[in-house]
Amino acid sequence: MTLCYLIFDASDDGADTGSWEAMASVRAADLPAVLAEVQQVLTAAARHSPGPRGALDEGGAWDADQQVQTDGDWTTVTLTLTGPWAWGEALMERFTLAE
């Protein structure tokens, strides 16, 4: 799958848990495309999940947080995934960046 807006940065906590965060700031005309990319990532994450979704400290195997904030003509969408490092890295390999 090709992503045009979301570029993920990964961080590892050293205990085999990682987080992957992407942020896109767009004008209203591009917001539907960004939200569609977010949905693609969430669908893939759920389809290939390592277990139940939920807060890791409450027994979940993975989780996601989506934030949308509008400031004037711009809307910023942030997506953060957390879960096992191997799962997240394999998930990220499913996506390619548009050139």
For the regions a protein language model found, what residue spans apply to each?
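Long, contiguous N-terminal structural blocks used for assembly/anchoring
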Residues: M1-G51, E58
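Amphipathic alpha-helical interaction segments
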Residues: D13, A28, T70, E93-T96
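Amphipathic protein-protein interaction modules
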Residues: A36-A86
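Mixed-charge, glycine-accented linear interaction segment located at domain edges/termini
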Residues: P84, G88-E99
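A structural signal for the main folded, soluble domain(s) of proteins
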Residues: L3-C4, Q66-W74, T96-E99
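Intrinsic disorder/low-structure terminal segments
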Residues: C4-I7, L81, R94
